């Protein structure tokens, strides 16, 4: 029998499952190398942790790793039901809150190593977390794709730690009771991008679709379709970062100015950015709450011990 020690939290409604122990050794190299080793040699640990019967499509996993640098608080590898994520904003907030719960960090500034670079996370006295993300930038503006049943859809391609297609003119109602229709629409847009061969830099697949609308109380409200067809309950940290990159490129938001991004369920991130040579460096602030601490058990004779894999 195998044992996986996990701590669950949610950030604005979006769950994060931090794996404290139980995964196999992945070496002591950079997080990108360890991610590759996990995906290549031990992917069944991801499926056991994230897929049913122990997990769900909405869950994001965060494998806690020893960092390469002695000056970093932790290393992390993010994953979900579809595979692996280079970076995860809500997951980083959940990880930092979990590290505090474990007694490993106190309020202050901490460095977290991820597969796409180091991020700076500040744990505030009220236990909210600010994440200074990796570089974000717009890759392409006003990209037009044909979406069957919806006609032409125009959006921007941007990087915020993951690849996004951001759409404002979509005609959809962004509300919690409309998520099924939103997911179907966003999925059709993603399929349209694939058919048209629209990608991120170096042919990277665009696996996140982000829809925006006006919000009466905040700067914007969004719906984000993640890889694997689950939607983000939080405002999406990497998606908000990609949005800031587009706003900055269009001259619609000044450096240091606050942007309040609401999610489809109403949770909120506060964000701002600093200019950089080839894009912007975003900072996202939000809060996570602990929800469970447990040991997942994998019995040797369990036919679904490694998850229900379709």
UniProtKB/Swiss-Prot annotation:
Its EC number is 5.1.1.8. Substrate binds at residues 89-90, 208, 232, 237-238. It catalyses: trans-4-hydroxy-L-proline = cis-4-hydroxy-D-proline. GO terms for molecular function: 4-hydroxyproline epimerase activity. Keywords: Isomerase. SUPFAM superfamilies: Diaminopimelate epimerase-like. It is an enzyme of class 5 (isomerase). The active site is at 88 (proton acceptor), 236 (proton donor). InterPro entries: Pro_racemase_fam. It comes from the Bacteria. Belongs to the proline racemase family. NCBIfam families: PRK13970.1 (NF010577). Catalyzes the epimerization of trans-4-hydroxy-L-proline (t4LHyp) to cis-4-hydroxy-D-proline (c4DHyp). Is likely involved in a degradation pathway that converts t4LHyp to alpha-ketoglutarate. Can also catalyze the dehydration of trans-3-hydroxy-L-proline (t3LHyp) to Delta(1)-pyrroline-2-carboxylate (Pyr2C), albeit with 42-fold lower efficiency. Displays no proline racemase activity. This is 4-hydroxyproline 2-epimerase. The lineage of its organism: Bacteria, Pseudomonadati, Pseudomonadota, Betaproteobacteria, Burkholderiales.
């Amino acid at each position: 029998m195998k044992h996986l020690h996990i701590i669950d939290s949610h950030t604005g409604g979006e769950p994060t499952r931090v794996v404290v122990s139980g995964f196999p050794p992945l070496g002591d190299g950079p997080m990108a190398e360890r991610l590759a080793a996990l995906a290549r040699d031990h992917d069944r640990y991801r499926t056991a942790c994230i897929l049913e019967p122990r997990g769900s499509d909405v869950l994001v996993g965060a494998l806690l790793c020893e960092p390469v640098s002695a000056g970093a608080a932790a290393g992390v590898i993010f994953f979900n039901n579809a595979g692996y994520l280079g970076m995860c904003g809500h997951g980083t907030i959940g990880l930092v809150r979990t590290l505090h719960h474990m007694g490993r960090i106190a309020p202050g500034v901490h460095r977290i190593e991820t597969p796409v670079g180091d991020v700076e996370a500040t744990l505030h006295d009220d236990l909210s977390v600010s994440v200074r993300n990796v570089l974000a930038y717009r890759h392409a503006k006003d990209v037009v794709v044909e979406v069957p049943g919806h006609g032409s859809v125009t959006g921007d391609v941007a990087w915020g730690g993951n690849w996004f297609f951001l759409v404002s003119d979509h005609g959809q109602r962004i509300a919690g009771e409309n998520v099924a229709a939103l997911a179907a629409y966003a999925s059709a847009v993603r399929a349209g991008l694939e058919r048209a061969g629209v990608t991120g830099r170096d042919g990277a697949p665009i696996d996140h679709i982000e829809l925006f609308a006006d919000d009466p109380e905040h700067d914007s409200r969004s719906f984000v379709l993640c890889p694997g067809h689950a939607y983000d309950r939080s405002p999406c940290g990497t998606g908000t970062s990609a949005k800031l990159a587009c706003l900055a490129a269009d001259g619609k938001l000044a450096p240091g100015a606050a942007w309040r991004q609401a999610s489809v369920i109403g949770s909120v991130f506060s964000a701002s950015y600093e200019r950089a040579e080839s894009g912007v460096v975003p900072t996202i602030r939000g809060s996570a709450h602990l929800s469970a601490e447990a040991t997942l058990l994998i019995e040797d004779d369990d036919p679904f011990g490694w998850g229900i894999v379709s």
